[in-house]
Amino acid sequence: MAIRCFGLMLALVRCLITLSIALLLQVGPAAAVLNSDSYDGNIYALYAGNGSLVPPASTLEESLAEGRTAVIVYYLDDSAVSKRFAPVVSELQRLWGRSIDLLPLSTDPLQGREALGAGDPATYWSGIIPQVVVIGTDGRVVFDQNGQVPLADINNAISTATGLPAPDLGRIDQEGSFNEVNIEVTAN
């Protein structure tokens, strides 16, 4: 009787293993989709090759207190327009480095709450993504635009805010994928 039970249990285990393997083989690979409003993860790591952008190294309040130029980029991880804009944000970090405080901020925590003053990112958010706000060393808004803002426009606004010459953009194609942008950046 015990041998018969053991044989049945062994057959059942084999059947379950076979079924599990069959189910695993039918699951498709995970894929990030640039042109969908699906959540794929950190958009800067996936679509700009730069996961170091979030969370930002400093806060808006710290930037204002230290008199540094702050560049706020409002985005959502589950937004196709934010995904397409991610390489521009990464390029800003490459161009300006430590000369500015680059603050890519998800708008999720800002939804439906009151702004708490100049040091609160909700103060400057218009409700549309992506949105780029450049705040000068004196705390004044120098630039505020929504949508697929041209890199050259942001670059010029940062130059005005910092008083530093704008870095040359070369021949970077803002509409390309991050791999194309990275290739063009390294080719210059």
Set out the residue ranges of the language-model regions.
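N-terminal secretory signal peptides that target proteins for export/translocation
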Residues: M1-L10
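Short active-site neighborhood of thiol/selenol oxidoreductases, capturing the structured segment around
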Residues: S63-D78
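Bacterial N-terminal signal peptides
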Residues: A11-Q26
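Typically the conserved alpha-helix immediately C-terminal to a functionally engaged Cys/Sec
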Residues: V81-W96
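N-terminal "domain-start" segment that seeds a small globular fold
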Residues: P29-T59
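Extracellular/periplasmic catalytic domains that process cell-envelope and extracellular macromolecules
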Residues: L64-E66, G97, Y124-I128
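Thiol-/selenol-based redox modules, centered on thioredoxin-like
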Residues: G147-N188
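Thioredoxin-like thiol-disulfide oxidoreductase module
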Residues: S90, D101-V142, L151-D153, A157-G163
